[in-house]
Amino acid sequence: MNVFEPRLSSWLENAGDDDDVVLSSRIRLARNLKDEQFPVYEQKEEIVDNIAEVFDDNFTLIKMNQISLLQKALLVEKHLISPYMMNKSEYGAVLLNEEENVSIMLNEEDHLRIQCMTPGLRLFDALEAALQIDGYVEEKLSYAFDKEFGYLTSCVTNIGTGMRASVMVHLPGLVTTKRIKSVIEAIRSLGFVVRGIYGEGSMPASNIFQVSNQVTLGKTETEIVEDLTQVMEQIIMQERVARTTIKQKFHIALEDRVFRSYGLLMNCRIISMKEASDAISDIRLGVELGFFEHISRQKMNELVLFSQPAFLRREAGRDMDELEEKVIRAKVIREILGDK
């Protein structure tokens, strides 16, 4: 297993429900050990070793103090660790399975953060996988748990189930029709959070948004997932309606925009992250509307992931200035699109 190779994790490679709009679903469970201090201010490496002993050879342990900053950034770009772990978790670690659809962060904000990812809108599948791992760990180790408040976490907003359910969606239709602001406001009014592609503190790129629950106390895991699934079904419906409206009312203008973006990415020699993200979103929309038969959703995910800064530094084999990064990005994008 070489997680640092430029390849997609299984949840970005395989097909899933409603994957014309939904890229992926994720369940994250935050847990702390009963007799250990948290929040994890003074991290103890022995906590990592004790937890890692619970898992078999199906998981690979990667310690943050044994890999480079570039390798940490690659894990962030693949959504396998958080930016917090990359920047602040000296004695943190991550356990990964071969498919890279299970990521267990150790010594992040909490002692354990179990993440399970699935393609498309499959929150219940992700929940089932996460709870199975959680139950296995709880048989071996004692969690910090309160009968009144539930699972105790470093951040009070996670107390209760300790669960964050999130869905990554591509919403170019709602952005183009200028309905995205009202949709986001409606989502927030229902108690959910909308963030960028890399979660808290990140900005949307390629018209990709992350929608997650805010409430973890007073509801069961199943109730939270049911609520988020219902919200996502409404968003999916509205996005599909917006796409149909654009195609019917502005067909030539839309086709021109999509093929201009395709021409740009196929021929560019220098391209910024923002310009690439906008063009990739246009082409992904074109793929979903049937303009391109030779481009798969998998290839679109490759364009998003492998045009990120850390993967470009890996491709170049060195650090780069801003211009060099734009040149390498253009080269990588041309190679991905040209590989039919």
Swiss-Prot record:
GO cellular-component term (any):
extracellular space
Q: Which residues bind ATP?
A: 24-28, 79, 113, 164-168, 195-200
User: What keywords sit in the KW lines?
Assistant: ATP-binding, Kinase, Nucleotide-binding, Transferase
Q: Give the family per the record.
A: Belongs to the ATP:guanido phosphotransferase family.
What PANTHER family is this protein classified in? ARGININE KINASE 1-RELATED, ARGININE OR CREATINE KINASE
What is the annotated role of this protein in its UniProt record? Catalyzes the specific phosphorylation of arginine residues in proteins.
What protein am I looking at?
Protein-arginine kinase
